[in-house]
Amino acid sequence: MKPYTQTTGLVAPLDRANVDTDQIIPKQFLKSIKRTGFGPNLFDEWRYLDVGQPGQNNSKRPLNPDFVLNQPRYQGASVLLARENFGCGSSREHAPWALDEYGFRTVIAPSYADIFFNNSFKNGLLPIILPEAEVDELFRQVEANEGYQLSIDLAAQTVTRPDGKVLGFEVDPFRKHCLLNGLDDIGLTLQDADAIRAFEDGYRQQQPWLFR
């Protein structure tokens, strides 16, 4: 997992509340257990005017010109600004996979569904919670200023606006440690690889009949 330290990125405003995981990545694209291949179908039912299918050539599909991610001013955005209860619905881990592969490293919203929130940290995506009033102000500023960027410093737990105003956010210390060091569940386990091997060797000597 790629470490998350400091980043400055273009902000895309998704002005919708209660965005569920089926809207983030529709169910027909969930047949793969790989972590890749989901970015092109992020928000598929909103980005395109037709119904997408796995393996389809998206370059030939008709785009929805009104959807925010299809607007030229938001191309290359790495910060997604959202409304309350983002990521609700089913527990599919494909949702943060799709957001990450599309290019988003950060989501900012007033609240999240618990499972999506937890899955995001485990997959290198930082879900920042800010008060609703601060999120409202960010929406106003993003929509009024083309090329609007935010600077996020995970170590300092700050979001800095272009006007210099600094917004603080809370994050669990363990989750912060994992993101800063690029540690997913596998990475955490591998940190104890020597101890695991030592235990297995000792157990094999104590209970040899189990390994015959």
From Swiss-Prot:
GO cellular component, one term: 3-isopropylmalate dehydratase complex
Keyword annotations: Amino-acid biosynthesis, Branched-chain amino acid biosynthesis, Leucine biosynthesis, Lyase
Broad class of enzyme this protein falls into: lyase
Reactions accelerated catalytically: (2R,3S)-3-isopropylmalate = (2S)-2-isopropylmalate
Superkingdom assignment: Bacteria
Subunit and partners: Heterodimer of LeuC and LeuD.
Function: Catalyzes the isomerization between 2-isopropylmalate and 3-isopropylmalate, via the formation of 2-isopropylmaleate.
Protein's name according to its UniProt entry: 3-isopropylmalate dehydratase small subunit
Species lineage: Bacteria, Pseudomonadati, Pseudomonadota, Gammaproteobacteria, Pseudomonadales
